[in-house]
A protein has these predicted regions:
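Intrinsically disordered, low-complexity segments enriched in serine/threonine/proline/glycine
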Residues: 10-11, 26
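Primarily a LysM-type cell-wall glycan-binding module
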Residues: 494-532, 537-553
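Membrane-lipid interaction segments
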Residues: 43, 49-502
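Short, Lys/Arg-enriched N-terminal segments with co-localized hydrophobic residues
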Residues: 22-47
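Intrinsic disorder/low-complexity segments
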Residues: 6-8
Length: 553
């Protein structure tokens, strides 16, 4: 064999075993003469040209997770139209959130604490009720950044409350309320979706998540007439629960239908004999949600914030109207999937990879679940008689059991009893429950928005044993938070310098479970070329196999 200059070209071929399980073959051919070095450099620059294609993805980011303490300090004056105080029975503190918004790097929560005092009156010793609102506004800093729509969760429970009668018309209330605020926002980021040119080889991965199209909150009012078997002398409580029964998404709007169930507890005469009356209050609302479409999915919940009963006058005298206010919350989202490059190398050039962590949130479950919580035990006064029972649901939490995430909640039962002195006492008992839903994720990777409400409550005493059964309805949405490593940038630098001499062919003994891409990256060869040379697939190997690794040159 001769070169263009007339000189003989030297050639040789011989095998060489370099490492156990890998055989390589040398094929030596002398370099040709009279080739312009400038043209070689131009060709190398052309081979190193790399095209990078990027796309914008929506990533989830926790921007606030804090706990605050709200003081409960007030002097409640009993109006003249209510009986005087003989004995304080129980004091409740309820959280009512009116508005949540993120602006200028701060999260603002507006609302009030509804302080309700039950007392036994002077004279006829009847059960009475008085209440007062304690407004608050709290601002907290959020994580710096440019954020999209944010989901804000606000919950809380009473840490302690002390209530005493200063005199027959003045009640002093002192306590603290624990407020929990969590916020998860969406941030826009870029990922590499494809690479081309420069002998680049790439491995892609699928990123799945849920993109919030929009969310909206609105205070609504629903009214309905209500009839009582006998005129109430005093209304003691109006416990409300709500449900969204139908949701329809149209262009830029969400049409919702549902109802609010109001349970009115009252007495018709002096004393402590209580009567319960329930009323369903339907509502229809249309909320503007920019970007909402029929192919989107939706989670909606209604949380009652208050209820009033007014009597008729004039021609409507004798007719009563019940009016319920509630916070209607709607979240519209759409499942999304992105393809991102997670690894890459070049068969022609040295590559520099820059990685990044992408956090995604994916809606995994939207549910309405009924659950029963039961508590048993003995009352402090063995002669006490139960006259009524109420219940207060407490915030739910995500816990981990046997490597899975479960939703656990607590509810407090309040038993109103007549003691041996014919006075009214209230005994509290907390009971726990877990929902029969399990998620194959660590608890730290699960985001749960849960809204428990009490459907019914009953209590009975048999001998010395007392039991209370509470039926709750929990509405919620559960999302999984995941983090994946993908490439943020890829650069081809200098031409690839191979340190394997003039090896023309290798034999590699691959094991089951190895990825063809990893094998190809080790030898800077094309995965498709290796698969074609061995008549096999280019993914994960299912069984041990001997592979021929062709030269990349």
């Amino acid at each position: 064999m001769e070169t263009p200059g007339g000189r003989p070209r030297k050639s040789a071929c011989f095998p060489l075993c370099r490492a156990p399980g890998v055989f390589v073959f040398f094929a030596y051919i002398a370099a040709p003469l009279h080739i312009d070095e400038l043209e070689q450099r131009k060709g190398r620059r052309g081979r190193m040209e790399l095209k990078v294609y990027k796309d914008t993805v929506t990533a989830a980011e926790s921007i606030c997770d804090t706990k605050l303490e709200l003081p409960v300090e007030t002097e409640m004056l009993i109006p003249d139209y209510l009986p005087q105080v003989f004995k304080i029975v129980k004091c409740f503190v309820y959280l009512v959130v009116l508005q949540k918004q993120v602006t200028a790097g701060r999260l603002t929560v507006d609302g009030y604490l509804r302080c309700v005092v039950y007392y036994q009156s002077e004279g006829d010793e009847s059960l009475c009720q008085a209440e007062q609102k304690l407004p608050f506004t709290k601002q907290v800093d959020v994580k710096p950044g440019s954020w999209g729509p944010a989901t804000v969760l606000v919950s809380g429970e009473t840490e302690y409350v002390n209530c005493r009668a200063v005199n027959q018309r003045r009640v002093d209330v002192r306590g603290a309320f624990a407020l929990s605020i969590e916020a998860v926002a969406e941030a826009q980021g870029e990922v590499i979706t494809a690479l081309a040119g420069g002998g680049i080889q790439q491995r892609t991965t699928s990123l799945t998540g849920s993109k919030t199209v929009g969310s909206q909150e609105k205070l609504i009012t629903a009214e309905e007439s209500i009839a009582f078997d006998a005129p109430p002398e005093m209304v003691l409580s109006t416990q409300c629960t709500g449900a969204v029964n139908e949701v329809k998404l149209v262009s830029g709007k969400a049409v919702l239908k549902g109802e609010i169930r109001a349970e009115v507890v009252y007495r018709t005469a002096p004393g402590h004999t209580l009567v319960h009356t329930t009323r369903q209050i339907p509502f229809n609302e249309i909320l503007d949600v920019e970007g909402a479409a029929e192919d989107c999915q939706c989670f909606a919940v209604v949380q009652p914030t208050g209820c009033t009963i007014t009597g008729g006058s004039g021609e409507d005298e004798g007719e009563n109207t019940i009016s319920a206010t509630a916070a209607l919350y709607v979240k519209v989202y759409r499942p999304v999937e992105y393809m991102a490059v997670s690894d890459a190398f070049s068969t022609e050039s040295e590559t520099v990879l820059t990685q990044q962590q992408v956090a995604l949130e994916e809606v995994a479950d939207v549910f309405t679940q009924q659950v029963e919580a039961v508590t048993t035990g003995q009352l402090p006064d063995e002669n006490a008689r139960i006259i009524d029972v109420m219940a207060t649901p407490l915030p739910m939490e995500v816990i981990e059991q046997d490597g899975e995430a479960v939703l656990r909640g607590r509810v407090m039962a309040h038993l109103l009893c007549i003691n041996a002195l014919e006075e009214i006492d209230c005994y509290d008992k907390v009971c726990e429950y877990t929902l029969p839903r399990r998620y194959p994720r660590p608890a730290a990777d699960v985001i749960a928005q849960c809204y428990p409400s009490v459907g019914s409550v009953s209590a009975r005493k048999v001998g010395d044993d007392t039991s209370a059964a509470i039926v709750l309805t929990v509405r919620g949405i559960v999302s999984f938070r995941s983090t994946q490593t993908v490439l943020a940038d890829v650069q081809c630098t200098s031409p690839l310098v191979r340190d394997d001499g003039d090896i023309a062919l290798r034999i590699y003994f691959a094991q089951a479970g190895e990825d063809m891409f990893d094998i190809a990256k080790r030898y800077a060869a094309s995965p498709e070329a290796i698969a074609a040379a061995n008549d096999t697939g280019s993914g994960i190997l299912e069984a041990p196999q001997r592979l021929l690794i062709p030269s990349a040159t």
